[in-house]
């Protein structure tokens, strides 16, 4: 296929009730478009399934119904989903409709989970991003992803990652991946494509290292390279930023790789660093101190800033929703869109993936991602680390009812720390 025909689109979910001057194509409309045009095959990698709407719109139900109808149209549908102890009614419905499903027991294999979220349609079109197969991801959670159309080369490369998961659904981890599902492109040899007439270099990275087949770039390597290659700025929007690994025994280990690289960029190269971190009722308290630590570096010659992003609550409240779930980074050179939270375990024992895109002219998709970041950074939903929050939506900020003076005050009796893997 002619790579000049490639189309790439940034997608996002803006939770109901939030207002921005400019928004991009919705996750729901993009998924619906992909499903309407799929004619032969659809592969989906997923953390869990909960598309059947509980409140509000029926966007999740619409997507689920469209997937269920695909086998009736002769489309082969394969779903790789993280093995869970809880029954997934949506998945059971998929199986009854003829969808091939494999439960991937990453917990048993590596200790983590299958957290990757991507689609591959007709071996030609792909979607990758933060959105789960959850109705909340279409209306109640702020998400960001990318869809790339008409590129068999990139779709084939992402399929190799899917085949690794599919293999692990019925097999143990092999001694090595030498003869299994090699990558076609990586950080040293990216795929060259044209998007809107502009040459771009693209590759897909995967995590963890144990599942990286021959020539596949590890996601952490891709992320660190993105930071190292920046010469002007690094802007990060992620749900969690915690430089720690949580052990099975409940202990914690310092995991400084990403934080060190950000500090090095700001201090050694005078790169501007901005971190926009999600905050909600389930945020980890330990994250606050790490964010304060890195924010304290800001000085005359070190330009590093941290803000918290709060999605306003719904009325009535909706559990496990109303949070910025995005996982991306944009520099003056590269757009990095991933599926992993920035906590150690997501790179050491949990499955994730990222798309790394560098336009020759520095604009295009990279510029769009920068515009989205700055829109959010400057919005009324972003707060300084020592601000007072008007609501209790953010565990990491004081709120009006907790403090009556201008001095920051922590909770007198902090809530119990929330285990990392209870977060999505």
Swiss-Prot record:
GO cellular component: virion component
Induction and repression of expression: Expressed in the intermediate phase of the viral replicative cycle.
Top-rank lineage group of the source organism: Viruses
Molecular function via GO: endonuclease activity
Residues spanning the signal sequence: none
UniProt-listed InterPro entries: Diverse_PLD-related, PLDc_3, PLipase_D/transphosphatidylase
Disulfide-linked positions: none
Compartment(s): Virion
SMART domains hit by this protein: PLDc (SM00155)
SUPFAM superfamilies linked to this entry: Phospholipase D/nuclease
Keyword list, A-Z: Endonuclease, Hydrolase, Nuclease, Repeat, Virion
Pfam families linked to this entry: PLDc (PF00614), PLDc_3 (PF13918)
Coiled coil: none
PLD phosphodiesterase domain sequence ranges: 110-137, 320-346
Gene3D superfamilies registered for this protein in UniProt: Endonuclease Chain A
Function: DNA nicking enzyme that cleaves extruded cruciform DNA at its tip. Probably nicks viral hairpins.
Family from the record: Belongs to the orthopoxvirus OPG042 family.
Protein's name in the database: Virion nicking-joining enzyme
Species the sequence originates in: Vaccinia virus (strain Western Reserve)
């Amino acid at each position: 296929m002619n790579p000049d025909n490639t189309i790439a689109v940034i997608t996002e979910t803006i939770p109901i009730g939030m207002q921005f001057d400019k928004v991009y194509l919705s996750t729901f409309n993009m998924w619906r478009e992909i499903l309407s045009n799929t004619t032969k095959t659809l592969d989906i990698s997923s953390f869990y399934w909960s598309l059947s709407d509980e409140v509000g719109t029926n966007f999740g139900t619409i997507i689920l119904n469209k997937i269920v109808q695909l086998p009736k149209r002769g489309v082969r549908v394969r779903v790789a989903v993280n093995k869970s102890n809880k029954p997934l009614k949506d998945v059971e419905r998929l199986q009854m409709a003829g969808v091939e499903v494999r439960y991937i027991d990453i917990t048993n294999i590596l200790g983590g989970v299958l957290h990757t979220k991507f689609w591959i349609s007709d071996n030609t079109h792909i979607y990758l991003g933060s959105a789960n197969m959850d109705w909340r991801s279409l209306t109640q959670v702020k998400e960001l992803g990318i869809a790339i159309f008409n590129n068999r080369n990139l779709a084939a490369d992402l399929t190799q990652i899917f085949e690794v998961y599919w293999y692990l659904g019925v097999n143990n981890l092999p001694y090595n991946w030498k003869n299994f599902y090699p990558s076609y492109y990586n950080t040293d040899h990216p795929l060259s494509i044209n998007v809107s007439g502009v040459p771009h270099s693209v590759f897909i990275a995967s995590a963890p290292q144990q599942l990286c087949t021959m020539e596949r770039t590890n996601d952490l390597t891709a992320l660190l390279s993105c930071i190292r290659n920046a010469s002007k700025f690094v802007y990060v929007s992620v749900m969690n930023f915690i430089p720690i690994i949580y052990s099975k025994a409940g202990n914690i280990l310092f995991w400084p790789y990403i934080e060190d690289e950000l500090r090095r960029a700001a201090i050694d190269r005078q790169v501007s660093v901005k971190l926009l971190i999600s905050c909600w009722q389930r945020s980890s308290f330990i994250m606050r101190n790490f964010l304060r630590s890195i924010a304290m570096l800001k000085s005359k010659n070190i330009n590093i800033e941290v803000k918290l992003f709060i999605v306003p609550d719904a009325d009535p409240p909706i559990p496990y929703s109303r949070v910025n779930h995005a996982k991306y980074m944009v520099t003056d050179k590269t757009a990095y869109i991933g599926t992993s939270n920035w906590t150690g375990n997501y790179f050491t024992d949990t499955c994730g993936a990222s798309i790394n895109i560098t336009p020759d002219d520095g604009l295009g998709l990279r510029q769009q991602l920068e515009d989205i970041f700055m829109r959010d950074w400057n919005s009324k939903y972003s707060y300084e680390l020592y601000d007072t929050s008007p609501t209790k939506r953010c565990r990491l900020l004081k709120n009006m009812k907790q403090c009556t003076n201008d001095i920051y005050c922590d909770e007198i009796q902090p809530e119990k720390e929330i285990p990392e893997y209870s977060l999505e």
